[in-house]
């Protein structure tokens, strides 16, 4: 009902404005055509009826559509404002990270240098340990080789001494002296 009042008010204002505009044109000169007010009245009435039918048939839907559209636009504006605020915050974070990037780079370099030094020290320590083990193993191998060589030389020398002694004894001792020596040693063994 309130909408119908507005519609009638608008139509009345349009009718008056049209009448005033036509009246301002002045008196019609002789032979000139006079304006047909009846035609204008029918046209305005036709227009008013058309608007009334549209309002009656789809008024609530149009109001709901434009009201819903208004709410949708308000919601979209609020969402855009929220996104704008979030974007400003993210931009601030990115700018802060960019500002801290040099410090972060220095920290990363320092960390990797420390890791590199630790790795270098570990490698050097392992290499020194391996070198000591190799030297000790070489010393043991050399000592074993020397011991083996000494034992081989002693064995060979003992064999040579035994051979030389046998030869010397065979040359100096004859059968009688051999029997005397055997008897002498057997007597010592039996007495002891």
UniProtKB/Swiss-Prot annotation:
<keyword id="KW-0472">Membrane</keyword>
<dbReference type="GO" id="GO:0045259">
    <property type="term" value="C:proton-transporting ATP synthase complex"/>
</dbReference>
<dbReference type="GO" id="GO:0005886">
    <property type="term" value="C:plasma membrane"/>
</dbReference>
<keyword id="KW-0066">ATP synthesis</keyword>
<keyword id="KW-1133">Transmembrane helix</keyword>
<keyword id="KW-0138">CF(0)</keyword>
<feature type="transmembrane region" description="Helical">
    <location>
        <begin position="7"/>
        <end position="27"/>
    </location>
</feature>
<comment type="function">
    <text>F(1)F(0) ATP synthase produces ATP from ADP in the presence of a proton or sodium gradient. F-type ATPases consist of two structural domains, F(1) containing the extramembraneous catalytic core and F(0) containing the membrane proton channel, linked together by a central stalk and a peripheral stalk. During catalysis, ATP synthesis in the catalytic domain of F(1) is coupled via a rotary mechanism of the central stalk subunits to proton translocation.</text>
</comment>
<keyword id="KW-1003">Cell membrane</keyword>
<keyword id="KW-0813">Transport</keyword>
<dbReference type="Pfam" id="PF00430">
    <property type="entry name" value="ATP-synt_B"/>
</dbReference>
<dbReference type="GO" id="GO:0046961">
    <property type="term" value="F:proton-transporting ATPase activity, rotational mechanism"/>
</dbReference>
<dbReference type="GO" id="GO:0046933">
    <property type="term" value="F:proton-transporting ATP synthase activity, rotational mechanism"/>
</dbReference>
<keyword id="KW-0406">Ion transport</keyword>
<comment type="function">
    <text>Component of the F(0) channel, it forms part of the peripheral stalk, linking F(1) to F(0).</text>
</comment>
<comment type="similarity">
    <text>Belongs to the ATPase B chain family.</text>
</comment>
<dbReference type="InterPro" id="IPR005864">
    <property type="entry name" value="ATP_synth_F0_bsu_bac"/>
</dbReference>
<dbReference type="InterPro" id="IPR002146">
    <property type="entry name" value="ATP_synth_b/b'su_bac/chlpt"/>
</dbReference>
<protein>
    <recommendedName>
        <fullName>ATP synthase subunit b</fullName>
    </recommendedName>
</protein>
<dbReference type="InterPro" id="IPR050059">
    <property type="entry name" value="ATP_synthase_B_chain"/>
</dbReference>
<comment type="subunit">
    <text>F-type ATPases have 2 components, F(1) - the catalytic core - and F(0) - the membrane proton channel. F(1) has five subunits: alpha(3), beta(3), gamma(1), delta(1), epsilon(1). F(0) has three main subunits: a(1), b(2) and c(10-14). The alpha and beta chains form an alternating ring which encloses part of the gamma chain. F(1) is attached to F(0) by a central stalk formed by the gamma and epsilon chains, while a peripheral stalk is formed by the delta and b chains.</text>
</comment>
<keyword id="KW-0812">Transmembrane</keyword>
<keyword id="KW-0375">Hydrogen ion transport</keyword>
<keyword id="KW-0997">Cell inner membrane</keyword>
């Amino acid at each position: 009902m309130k909408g119908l009042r507005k519609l009638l008010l608008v139509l009345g204002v349009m009718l008056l404005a049209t009448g005033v505009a036509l009246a301002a044109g002045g008196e019609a000169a002789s032979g000139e055509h006079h304006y047909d007010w009846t035609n204008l009245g029918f046209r305005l009435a036709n227009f008013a009826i058309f608007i009334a039918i549209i309002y009656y048939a789809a008024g609530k839907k149009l109001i709901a559509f434009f009201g819903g559209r208004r709410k949708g636009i308000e919601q979209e504006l609020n969402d855009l404002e929220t996104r704008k605020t979030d974007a400003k915050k993210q931009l601030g974070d990115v700018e802060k990270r960019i500002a801290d990037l040099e410090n972060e780079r220095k920290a990363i370099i320092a960390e990797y240098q420390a890791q590199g030094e630790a790795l270098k020290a570990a490698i050097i320590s392992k290499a020194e340990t391996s070198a000591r083990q190799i030297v000790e193993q070489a010393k043991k191998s050399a000592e074993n080789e020397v011991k083996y060589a000494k034992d081989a030389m002693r064995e060979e020398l003992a064999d040579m001494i035994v051979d030389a002694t046998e030869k010397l004894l065979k040359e100096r001792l004859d059968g009688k002296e051999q029997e005397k020596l055997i008897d002498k040693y057997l007597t010592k063994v039996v007495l002891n």
